Amino acid sequence: MIVTTTNSVEGYQISEYKGIVVGEAIMGANVVRDVFAQITDIVGGRSGAYESKLQDARETALSELEDRARALGANAVVGVDLDYEVVGQSMLMVSASGTAVVIG
């Protein structure tokens, strides 16, 4: 499945729009607390443990986005946008949204 932030896929024509799809992942309170507890992991102002958790959440959100697009019969998702939101006091939500399409 092709997933892109652009509104089209070079070399392909969009033949059908299937609708908006969204994938989400939430890092729970314990994960965020554990990451900040490992602050000694910081090198050059960056936390490897925190970045790893963010990457996992981003990959989960994108995987869920692809699964939902496949369920609609799409073979690509265009116009993908990633958002990061703090939920409550100690949770982080990563959401990926885009338009499921059929390209050929």
Swiss-Prot record:
HAMAP family: UPF0145
Signal peptide stretch: none
Classification via InterPro entries: UPF0145_dom_sf (IPR035439), UPF0145_YbjQ-like (IPR002765)
Annotated protein name in UniProt: UPF0145 protein TM1040_1243
Family: Belongs to the UPF0145 family.
Organism of provenance: Ruegeria sp. (strain TM1040) (Silicibacter sp.)
Pfam families in alphabetical order: YbjQ_1 (PF01906)
